[in-house]
Amino acid sequence: MNDVATTNQSEPALSEPQQTVAGVGMVQGRGLMHGSEVELQIQPAPAGHGIVFERSDLDPPVRIPAVVDYAVDRDRRTVLCDGEVVVETVEHCLSAIRGCGIDNALLSVNGPEIPLGDGSADPFVQAIQDVLSLIHI
């Protein structure tokens, strides 16, 4: 499934201005489901890339686009899956990305889930605002 396009109808057309972050934002902490320490890096990406999660702890790293085609049904959390590779609890991170107007970013995480933080989107918003000099691409 990794060959599927990373854009969908809710994302801007390539002819429209798109935005990414100007640097790397980071969120660290424990995951909710597994409880392990994880780090999420919010990295710039080129126009048309979309929002893509990367499991950097795997060799080779596996990328999973944040589109509905990769969503799987799990209780009380949003999970993206490509084959056996999952990224869990992505909902607050994706809310922050969308709310901050980011169209393209590589979200690199070194484990199977996103850090919980305080249970809201705020830690992700803060990480984005740290590198929020948005680049129009």
Feature annotation, model-predicted:
Residues 2-63:
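N-terminal basic/disordered segments at the start of proteins
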Residues 32-34, 44-46, 58-132:
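N-terminal, charged/glycine-rich beta-strand/loop interface patches
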Residues 135-137:
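Conserved small/polar residues in nucleotide/adenosyl-binding loops
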